[in-house]
Amino acid sequence: MTREISLGYVPLVDAAPLIIADVLGFAEEQGLRLRLERAANWSMLRDMLDQGQVAAAQMLSVMPVARALGLGSGGSKLETPMLLSLGGQMVGVSAPVGAGLERAGHDFGFSDAAAAVQAVAALGQPLRVGVPFAHSMQALLLGDWLAGLPSGMVELRTVAPPLMPEALAEGELDAFCVGEPWGSQAVVSAGARLLLPGTAIRPAMPEKVLALRGGWCEAQPDLAGRLVRALSRAGGWLSNPRNAATAAEIVTRPSRVDVAAELVERALLGRIVTDRAGSEHVV
């Protein structure tokens, strides 16, 4: 008998296992029908899970830890039966800050975190830095990377990933750390310059997990196991570079991840264009 499971996600490249499991039949092979529910931001997705609107969700890896420590809003304990992604974050700056770095001689090498933060510090200007959520790997990475800057120089602002490019274009942010494809989209639509992948600050950091309400796995172990297997097989399919173009086309269909398929394909292949001049770096 086919069982339906509702899954919540925020439109990012690492929502791909959920989308691919649904579209290409990996869920069906496990006797599941997935009902995917898109959320505009992480607060909304958290609330959807807490209120039972979805049974499971793609989630920032730090959010269940913060919940267990009593940080942020209340709610039930969260279970995380599997990791969905490692890394995938991009650190970038607005067009004006990028121009200042270029005038100062920064090489935009996209790999040296120490050189990049020294260049940013040398500008000597306050920075409004966008992160997708207060309790996120992005916020932790930035805290590590920017730790040596003078007190008060950095103001972290929470901005939903799909809104990060718009916030840069409107002059509301000077820098950001966000998951793909929104760093690449910021290059396209806001003239941002990408400085580093998150892995240049800390390699192999857990980025997204599959989250379920506390007790769900224990109450329905067979169903939880089938869901994990479906997503794992979708992840295996996604790991094959030959599938990147097909995956990108599926993930960017209407009402899923609203960017050009080319940006998602580049992210899946680890080939990131870091400026409007077309500079490409492999991560």
Model-derived regions: residue spans:
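Secondary-structure end/capping motifs
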Residues: P221-V283
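Short acidic loop-to-helix transition motifs that present clustered carboxylates
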Residues: N41-W42, V159-P162
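Short, glycine-/small- and polar/acidic-enriched structural segments
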Residues: R3-P150, D174, V178-P181, G191-G198, ...
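General small-molecule cofactor/ligand-binding pocket signal
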Residues: R35-E37, E155-V159
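Inter-helical turn/loop segments and adjacent helix faces that build the functional surface
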Residues: L149-V154, E218-R226
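Loop-centered beta-sheet repeat module
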Residues: P162-R213, C217, A224
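A bilobed periplasmic-binding-protein/Venus flytrap-type ligand-binding module shared by bacterial periplasmic
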Residues: Q89-E102, P206-L223, W237
